[in-house]
């Protein structure tokens, strides 16, 4: 499992808001999109990003600013987990992504 200095977790309402927040995080910070989860019939979206502590913190701060302005009441939570435990990374990085990466290695 790949390691990251930090993992950012964002919970927001509505898919379109999640996509916009993810786009802003990826454009503004050197973070990698790790995975998404949907609950409540797709109404609640959880995004996971990884990278250095400073870059993940920057991405999460940007999302919080969006949540206080344009998307007030849509952002439910946004946190940074510094130095995540390896078990957290196993959960965050889905087995599907690991399988896809291994398939790419075999095919290349």
Could you tell me what each predicted segment is?
Residues 1-44, 50-108:
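Long, contiguous binding/interaction regions
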């Amino acid at each position: 499992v790949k390691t990251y200095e930090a993992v950012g977790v964002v919970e927001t309402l509505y898919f379109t808001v999640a996509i916009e927040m993810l786009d802003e995080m990826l454009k503004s910070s050197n973070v990698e999109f790790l995975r998404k989860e949907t609950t409540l019939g797709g109404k609640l979206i959880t995004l996971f990003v990884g990278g250095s502590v400073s870059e993940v913190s920057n991405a999460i701060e940007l999302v919080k600013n969006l949540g206080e302005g344009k998307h007030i009441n849509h952002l439910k939570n946004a946190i940074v987990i510094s130095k995540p435990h390896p078990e957290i990374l196993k959960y965050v990085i889905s087995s599907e992504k690991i399988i896809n990466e291994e398939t790419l290695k075999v095919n290349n």
